């Protein structure tokens, strides 16, 4: 024995065939933008009832996708707030009371300040792969979230979350696709159960 400790490989216990490379540890902020939201003045009617989707945490429940918000803002409301336009494929992540509720945007929209949304960098992070890590992100958010009034996780705190990641988009997409099919199957069976009773 040469006295050197054998280097441990960074690979998951279960893996899809055809993937052999070690996984790597990456900070979320290296592979995605973390984007907060904002609220136009509620005292100005010209900011509201427009065409721009504007999500609040109460709208995020057990659904996987969101495509239309309860409240909408106008272009003027958007321009006069700190809300940011989020592209389709963004994972909305609630950052205040009820940390870690998530949904995937199917069309562009924005949020109030109760979110730190995850906008994957193209070619570096698969939307459904990161969505499948929701429970891990939620645990971290609750652990580090701090506030005198209520628990909250900041964009800076989200950006430094370290995740073990497949080194290739192909493996991320394979994992994401697997969980997407599984979620779709669960949703289908839940609907069938509703019709039975």
Where does each model-flagged region fall?
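Short amphipathic coiled-coil heptad-repeat segments
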Residues: 1-21, 191-197
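DNA target-recognition domains and sequence-specific DNA-contacting regions of bacterial/archaeal
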Residues: 2, 6, 29-165
């Amino acid at each position: 024995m040469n006295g050197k400790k054998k280097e441990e490989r960074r690979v998951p216990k279960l893996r899809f065939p055809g993937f052999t490379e070690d996984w790597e540890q990456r900070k979320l902020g290296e592979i995605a933008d973390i984007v907060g939201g904002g609220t136009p003045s509620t005292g100005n009617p010209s900011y509201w009832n427009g065409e721009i989707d504007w999500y609040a945490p109460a709208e995020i429940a057990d659904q996987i996708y969101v495509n239309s918000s309860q409240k909408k803002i106008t272009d003027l409301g958007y321009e006069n707030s700190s809300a940011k336009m989020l592209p389709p494929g963004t994972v909305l992540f609630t950052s205040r009371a009820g940390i870690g509720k998530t949904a995937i945007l199917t069309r562009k929209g924005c949020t109030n300040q109760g979110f730190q949304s995850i906008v994957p960098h193209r070619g570096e992070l698969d939307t459904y792969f990161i969505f499948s890590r929701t429970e891990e992100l939620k645990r971290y958010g609750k652990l580090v979230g701090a506030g005198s009034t209520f628990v909250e996780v900041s964009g800076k705190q989200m950006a430094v979350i370290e995740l073990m990641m497949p080194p290739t988009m192909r493996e991320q997409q394979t994992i994401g696709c697997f969980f997407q099919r599984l979620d779709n199957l669960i949703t289908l069976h839940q609907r069938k159960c509703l019709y039975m009773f």
